[in-house]
Design a protein with these regions (language model features):
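Conserved MFS/SLC helix-loop-helix module at the cytosolic interface between two early adjacent transmembrane helices
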Residues: 61-99
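Intracellular juxtamembrane helix-capping segments at the cytosolic ends
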Residues: 115-129, 312-325
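Helix-to-loop junctions at the C-terminal end of transmembrane segments
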Residues: 62-74, 260-273, 356
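Extracytoplasmic
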Residues: 10-45, 62-66, 152, 226-233
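A late C-terminal transmembrane helix in Major Facilitator Superfamily
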Residues: 148, 327-359
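Symmetry-related core transmembrane helices of the 12-TM Major Facilitator Superfamily/SLC fold
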Residues: 166-184, 363-380
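C-terminal transmembrane helical hairpin of 12-TM major facilitator-type secondary transporters
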Residues: 253-257, 271-320
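Extracytoplasmic gate region of multi-pass secondary transporters
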Residues: 30-34, 208-259
Length: 384
């Protein structure tokens, strides 16, 4: 039975809000809480970031299982379970009395990340809407694109008011009181709406070449995204921007991502996702050329181009596998496609940080080069 348009809007709003909480309470926590966490154990903050990197590797191992489970039974139960796992991991952090428990808490959060972030949400929408999930996928990324906008200030407020342990406990309670009920609002099973053009029951197996190319694209673009998230201010200062300009330019990435997703929702949705993905992948290399060519004054242009490309690529990671390979087995396939990306993402801050320390601004050619390779890989993928 077709889901009413109003119900469709509520599903996107509920899942997008739950995703905002998931990202804000995991991916964006270390930027605010790593230093006080480490200080309470007499450790360097690098240990907390190391624990977070471990969590991303854990999420890579969980993702394929979670995706396959969503393919079989729908996403509602898996996403609800992810909220319980997130809450448990955050609670372990809140009561951790030793570095071992700190790492254990992050490992549990990594399980929650593998079950409850974008890949699981995209698979849930594919189970409900089939090949018509592109619009809803864009919708939840529009909402969750504000995760850092919400998460960093809220984590900072809880830290300043109560402390880092209470901040972790606060996020755990938010999962139980808000995110879990929102995910419970989702349809049970795979309540598929009928597509305007019915999908075939079975088609030829996906091209192994296309799968490998797509896995490569996802891995290197996630590497670039994470490297820039960790080191953008330092990179822009190496180009000649002042500290204030670097911070101000960095603040433009979030709005650029959201603006690009609005463009995808309004204009680019008329085209095959490969078209928008190719344009998006070329944005970072173009931004790098601007930064090297014009130095510090190009900081804003770099941030806007990188942010816009990253915003559309986030959507493409959900829509491209759906458009190329269909919705059958989508969740498991998405989990496997993103597993290398999570591992490389975990290493990105260390690798690019070392390159920036050794080469200064010229380190940008590392990310520009692999961004160009991603564009070439996307050009090598054919719609059929």
């Amino acid at each position: 039975m077709r889901l009413p348009p109003a119900r469709k809007g509520w599903i996107v709003a509920a899942l997008g809000t739950a995703q905002t909480i998931g990202w804000a309470s995991s991916y964006y926590v270390p930027a605010v809480l790593a230093a006080p966490m480490a200080a309470s154990f007499d450790l360097s903050p690098v240990w907390v970031f190391g624990a977070f990197s471990m969590a991303m590797v854990v999420s890579a191992t969980v993702g394929p299982w979670a995706g396959a489970r969503i393919d079989r039974i729908g996403g509602r139960g898996v996403l609800i379970l992810s909220n319980l796992v997130f809450a448990a991991g955050l609670a372990v952090l809140a009561v951790a009395g030793s570095p071992g428990l700190l790492f254990l808490g992050w490992a549990v959060i990594g399980i929650g990340m593998g079950m409850g972030l974008y890949e699981a949400a995209f698979a849930t929408l594919a189970g409900i809407y089939g090949k018509e999930a592109r619009g809803p996928i864009t919708g939840i990324t529009l909402i969750a694109g504000f995760a850092s906008t919400v998460g960093w200030p809220l984590s900072g407020l809880m830290l300043a008011t109560w402390g880092w342990r209470e901040a972790c406990l606060g996020w755990a309670l938010i999962h139980l009181a808000l995110a879990l009920p929102l995910n419970a609002f989702l349809p049970k099973g795979t309540e598929r709406i009928p597509a305007e053009t019915p999908e075939p029951a079975a088609g030829p197996p996906p091209s192994r070449r296309a799968l490998w190319l797509l896995a490569f694209v996802f891995a290197v673009t996630w590497f670039n995204s994470t490297a820039m998230a960790a080191h953008l201010p330092g990179l822009l200062q190496a180009a000649g921007a002042s500290s204030a300009m670097a911070i101000a330019a960095g603040a433009m990435i979030g709005p650029a991502q959201v603006a690009a997703r609005v463009l995808e929702f309004g204009l680019l949705r008329r085209f095959h996702p490969l078209i928008s993905a190719r344009l998006a992948a070329s944005a970072h290399p173009l931004a790098a050329v601007c930064l090297v060519g014009f130095g510090g004054p190009a900081a804003y242009a770099f941030a806007l181009l990188h942010g816009a490309g990253n915003g559309i690529l986030t959507i493409a990671k959900g829509t491209l596998p759906l458009a190329l390979f269909g919705s059958a087995g989508y969740g498991a396939r998405l989990g496997w496609l993103n597993a290398p990306a999570r591992v490389l993402q975990a290493a990105a801050p260390l690798i690019f940080g070392a390159a920036l320390a050794a080469w200064g601004l010229q380190a940008i050619w590392l990310t520009a080069g692999i961004g160009a390779l991603a564009t070439l890989a996307l050009l090598a993928i054919r719609r059929g």
